[in-house]
Amino acid sequence: NPIIDKYIPINKSYKIYLSANTDIYQTGKLLLKHFDVRIFRRMIRDLYTRSTSIDETLKIWQKVRLGENLYIDPFKDDANYHINSFHAYELCIYKKILKSFESDSKELNKLKNSLKDFEELSAEVAPKDSVLQEFLPKN
């Protein structure tokens, strides 16, 4: 962010961009975009750490994306290093967590349906020091 950069000498900073940046394909067909993976993360984190319902998170998601487009995306190419934080097994965990949530939300049902061919996994398979822990329910 240039506002912060002007106060830190370039030789004293190292910029890291961390995000789930993997699109998911099934038999050559796009199943989920990387931002769909991120909405799964956001729905579950908000539910368990912010007491925000899944439906409420879905309602504000477009505003969240707008904020990213305005305040994060323009600067991601300035990062010295990019880390793709996607874990191949995380969708299996989300399937298990979300299966008990019923909703009239077409968006939630579409997202849940996109996981139909995935196996279910317990959140306990995620290592305790994984960045994924930020998005999982705490026991």
Model-found features: residue ranges?
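Conserved NTP phosphate-binding and transfer environment spanning the P-loop NTPase/kinase superfamily
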Residues: P2-N139
